[in-house]
Amino acid sequence: MPIKIPDTLPAFETLVHEGVRLMTETEAIRQDIRPLQIGLLNLMPNKIKTEIQMARLIGATPLQVELTLVRVNGHRPKNTPEEHLLAFYETFEEVEARKFDGFIITGAPIETLEYEEVTYWKELQRIFDWTTTNVHSTLNVCWGGMAAVYHFHGVPKYPLKEKAFGVYRHQNLQPSSVYLNGFSDDFAVPVSRWTEVRRADIDRVPDLEILMESKEVGVCLVHEKKGNRLYMFNHVEYDSTSLSEEYFRDVDAGVPIKLPHDYFPHNDSALPPQNRWRSHAHLFFGNWINEIYQTTPYELAKIGTGER
């Protein structure tokens, strides 16, 4: 089944070109099934790029999904036109009364700040708390994952001596997990962060289970059964060129940065990188969407009540 997004959203044309099945409002109405309601709280500066990355993966699943784009009020992004936000985004207040089958909270390039220093931290805390009653399953990504596991469990983040940056091998620690169905034992994941959460802190929380980990860059994916939450600290959703764009951006700005680990062929930044994580990114999002479909109440109003 396709994903339903506004026909005029910039991501629409890109995704059609890539072969992702999309659906218009009229086509959605003709299908006599309830589409899964997925919200995306987009905290990234370049919102359009993130919309494409997330919609590409969600839209590849065999279920009808309706995607709602959400933004915080406490911050105005510099890299996304105001007209785009007004046309395609809802504020949290505008969706607060709604229920969602799934909700994604993205990262943001503010990880070196203390959480309490973030201008929209109190609003984000409200959103985290709201997901416990209004969302069936929440996927918190990168900084969003670190912020969420700190908010709910007090798990701290630690600064790294140098940026974890590149494509790193990760291990499948729980092959029987529904979220890792079809995963290899060892696979590649893009990483781009200045901070980390540590296994020792996560192991102290009985409700948390580590699903993916790298020997080089640590914990990647954590599942919380009680709250039906996932904490993904890396970037399976990244495009083939995302890391190179970050690298050349820093080079052009004069920011000291090493070549991304195991990314450019022969460590030559003049050569186009090869995507070695795409299949597992699709697997992960497909597994997440499928688990939501299998377990969410048919009636949206029952989400958060414990009823099916």
From Swiss-Prot:
Looking at the UniProt record for this protein, which Gene Ontology cellular component terms does it annotate, in alphabetical order? cytoplasm
Name a biological process GO annotation.
L-methionine biosynthetic process from homoserine via O-succinyl-L-homoserine and cystathionine
The entry's keywords: Acyltransferase, Amino-acid biosynthesis, Cytoplasm, Methionine biosynthesis, Transferase
The subcellular localization recorded is: Cytoplasm
Q: Which InterPro entries match?
A: Class_I_gatase-like, HST_MetA, MetA_family
Recorded catalytic reaction(s): these are: L-homoserine + acetyl-CoA = O-acetyl-L-homoserine + CoA
According to UniProt, this protein's pathway is:
Amino-acid biosynthesis; L-methionine biosynthesis via de novo pathway; O-acetyl-L-homoserine from L-homoserine: step 1/1
> According to UniProt, where does the site described as Important for acyl-CoA specificity lie?
E111
Molecular function via GO = homoserine O-acetyltransferase activity; homoserine O-succinyltransferase activity
List residue numbers at the site (Important for substrate specificity): S192
Q: Where does substrate bind?
A: K163, S192, R249
Catalytic site positions = C142 (acyl-thioester intermediate), H235 (proton acceptor), E237
Please name the top-level EC class of this enzyme. Answer: transferase
EC number from the UniProt entry: 2.3.1.31
Its function, per the record, reads: Transfers an acetyl group from acetyl-CoA to L-homoserine, forming acetyl-L-homoserine.
> What family does this chain come from, according to its entry?
Belongs to the MetA family.
What is the protein's given name?
A: Homoserine O-acetyltransferase
Please report the organism this UniProt entry assigns to the protein: Rhizobium meliloti (strain 1021) (Ensifer meliloti)
